[in-house]
């Protein structure tokens, strides 16, 4: 099974991906996480350091694939999760999608791509071009990370459109949304009411999730010294269980951008029309409709 994780930049995809990877491994799967971001920090909380990238290794070998061994590019992470960082071209040059393709090509050359029960692609930022959608070419499922805010849900909607486009030629389905670090879910619920899709899990607004990233540890590793965090790990285990159940998934319905703006702005502005909480809701909106 191959899973692509997408979401707005900075929403917590890598932190969530690492914890999901460990949860999948805890359920008995042999897991590989592939970071698809030039920052090459996807697997940081699994390994505790920035591992060498595929592109770095290929360049050091002058792109002679036959000189590269699995241990050159596959690094062991916490919980038995194997880790790969694709890396990327220099800033302002090249295509991230090409790098993902080279990564998969090399792993196939090493007979490693099909050795895993689950491969999780952690993909950078929003989908703005075909290159960044490249991991969808290999995925069985896509999981979108969001929160209860406008920007994250707007990005989620754009990603859903990309998934719908890919389903025309690939056996890809959207597994659902994961809400990350949010105390409310009203906007998430409003969105999935108009664009039906599963909400796999909503993670609570817990500061330790953010702190884990700074510490370079997953929540599962932090539990060793902070047993009180064990309940947070149950959220990730629930996500893993739902993924492992091989859900039917969906082909997302496309919502045009203007309709999406109206949908969420109405959610904020309705209380204003009622004369209730107007000022607070306006501050939450964070933009002006023109």
Swiss-Prot record:
Record: residues binding ATP: 10-15, 39, 180-181
Subcellular location: Plastid, Chloroplast
Pfam families for this protein: Fer4_NifH
Pathway annotation: Porphyrin-containing compound metabolism; chlorophyll biosynthesis (light-independent)
GO terms of molecular function: 4 iron, 4 sulfur cluster binding; ATP binding; metal ion binding; oxidoreductase activity, acting on iron-sulfur proteins as donors; oxidoreductase activity, acting on the CH-CH group of donors, iron-sulfur protein as acceptor
Gene3D superfamilies: P-loop containing nucleotide triphosphate hydrolases
EC main group: oxidoreductase
Reaction(s) catalysed by this chain's protein: chlorophyllide a + oxidized 2[4Fe-4S]-[ferredoxin] + 2 ADP + 2 phosphate = protochlorophyllide a + reduced 2[4Fe-4S]-[ferredoxin] + 2 ATP + 2 H2O
GO biological process: light-independent chlorophyll biosynthetic process; photosynthesis, dark reaction
GO CC annotation, single: chloroplast
Cofactor detail note: Binds 1 [4Fe-4S] cluster per dimer.
Binding-site residues for Mg(2+), renumbered to this chain: 14
Cofactor(s) for this UniProt protein: [4Fe-4S] cluster
Job of this protein: Component of the dark-operative protochlorophyllide reductase (DPOR) that uses Mg-ATP and reduced ferredoxin to reduce ring D of protochlorophyllide (Pchlide) to form chlorophyllide a (Chlide). This reaction is light-independent. The L component serves as a unique electron donor to the NB-component of the complex, and binds Mg-ATP.
Family: Belongs to the NifH/BchL/ChlL family.
Protein name: Light-independent protochlorophyllide reductase iron-sulfur ATP-binding protein
Species per Swiss-Prot/TrEMBL record: Cycas taitungensis (Prince sago)
